[in-house]
């Protein structure tokens, strides 16, 4: 009996231990389950912090990129400004007036060898095209001048240059007076003739317009109308000229 009681007590202890172990496992499992959402929340918080850090880093990188682009644009503008032509610094000093270079060039020209046919005109010996062009222009000018002189001679053959005589040592005052009176009379006649001519033209224009409006209004063909108008105007004009000449003779 004593041994059985010992075995039972041992079994009871074992069952108690197993039960306690099972309870501990359950409690630990529940604790793990309760800790998992806490871990998830912690992970989410860490991820949010990482996102904020990444966004802040992206913003800072954008700002840096913008600053770099602005700096590059400024550099490009400076380079463009540098592209403008600047005055080259002269190698000569302030006190050098270029006389040495000029003297060297003149000496080189004077010491150059010229051929016999170039010695007449040594200045343009190296550029003969200009010489030929200038010679052709001179010849053209001379030819034009000669043609104008011949034209003047032909026109001056039929002209009387000494219409009014010039008083000389002899007594020619009466002849000069007669010539001047004749010239004044001829001028008056020419003036009267010009006035009568213009008056006749105006009179024919007025009369033809009246006749056209009265008699030729029925004609619709423009060409026939023009021919009749020209015939009428010619006849009227000649009649008026004849009448003016007859009145002068009377």
From Swiss-Prot:
Constituent of pre-60S ribosomal particles. Required for large subunit rRNA maturation, in particular processing of the 27S pre-rRNA at the A3 and B1 sites to yield 5.8S and 25S rRNA. Keywords: Nucleus, Phosphoprotein, Ribosome biogenesis, rRNA processing. It comes from Saccharomyces cerevisiae (strain ATCC 204508 / S288c) (Baker's yeast). The gene is RRP15. This is Ribosomal RNA-processing protein 15. Residues 1-27 have a biased composition (Basic and acidic residues). It is found in: Nucleus, Nucleolus. One of its GO terms (cellular component) is nucleus. GO terms for biological process: maturation of 5.8S rRNA; maturation of 5.8S rRNA from tricistronic rRNA transcript (SSU-rRNA, 5.8S rRNA, LSU-rRNA); maturation of LSU-rRNA; maturation of LSU-rRNA from tricistronic rRNA transcript (SSU-rRNA, 5.8S rRNA, LSU-rRNA).
């Amino acid at each position: 009996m004593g041994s059985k009681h010992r075995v039972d007590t041992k079994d009871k202890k074992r069952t108690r231990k197993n039960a306690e172990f099972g309870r501990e496992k359950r409690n630990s499992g529940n604790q793990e389950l309760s800790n998992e959402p806490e871990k998830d929340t912690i992970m989410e918080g860490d991820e949010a912090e990482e996102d904020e850090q990444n966004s802040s880093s992206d913003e800072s990188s954008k700002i840096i990129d913008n600053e770099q682009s602005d700096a590059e644009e400024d550099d490009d503008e400076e380079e463009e400004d540098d592209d403008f032509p600047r005055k080259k610094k002269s190698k000569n000093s302030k006190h050098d007036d270029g006389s040495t270079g000029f003297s060297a060039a003149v000496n080189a020209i004077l010491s150059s060898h010229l051929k016999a046919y170039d010695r007449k005109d040594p200045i343009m010996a190296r550029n003969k095209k200009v010489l030929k062009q200038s010679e052709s222009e001179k010849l053209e000018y001379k030819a034009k001048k000669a043609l104008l002189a011949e034209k003047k001679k032909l026109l001056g053959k039929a002209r009387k240059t000494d219409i009014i005589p010039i008083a000389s040592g002899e007594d020619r005052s009466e002849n000069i007076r007669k010539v001047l009176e004749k010239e004044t009379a001829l001028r008056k006649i020419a003036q009267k003739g010009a006035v009568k001519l213009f008056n006749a033209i105006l009179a024919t224009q007025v009369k033809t317009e009246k006749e056209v409006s009265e008699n030729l209004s029925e004609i619709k063909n423009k060409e026939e109308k023009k021919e009749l108008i020209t015939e009428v105007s010619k006849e009227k004009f000649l009649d008026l000229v004849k009448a003016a000449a007859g009145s002068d003779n009377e």
